[in-house]
C-alpha cells in the first residue's frame, strides 16, 4: 500500500487513510499455508475440518482478526499498519483506520484504500504518478488479483477512482506478494524515493 501511496503523497499530503487488508495465509508462515491446504482436502473428502494456526476454519471463510487485541479494539496488526504508514510516509499527523482480515488465499495480500489529500488529485494524475514510480509498482487497467500477483516483486495497483464521499479522496485497490515484496524492502524504496524528491 505504501508503495502505491508514496508517489501520491509527493503530489499532496495525505490527511486521512481508511484501509481494509485481505491477507493471505502465507502471512502466518508455512503453517498457515499447510492449514489451508489440509482444510481444503478435509472439505473435499467430507471430513471434519480441524484448525490450529487460525482461531477458526480459514477454508471457505474469512477471519477479521490478525494478531491480538489492544484495549482500543484494534488488533496488533492493525496498529502496526497504522503506525508504520505514518512513519514510512513521514506523516505523523495522518489519521488512519484499518481492518486486517485473513482470507483463504495462499500468497499475495490485497488492500482496499481510501486516501484523502490536502489538495485534489485527479485519477489521471494518480495513475501517471504511480506508473512513473520506480519502486516496482505496476498501474493496472485490469483488476489486480492475488492469483496473478504471486511469486513476483511487483505491487499491482488498480481500480483508481475518485471518492464519492470525500472531496479530495481517491479509492484504489492493491495486490502484491508479501513474501517477495515485504515491508522492509518497501520501506527502503519509499524512503529513498521521498529523499530524492524533497
Question: Which residues make up each language-model segment?
Answer:
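C-terminal active-site/capping subdomain that shapes the small-molecule cofactor and substrate pocket
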Residues: 93-198
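Active-site-lining helix/loop region of Rossmann-like oxidoreductase modules
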Residues: 1-129
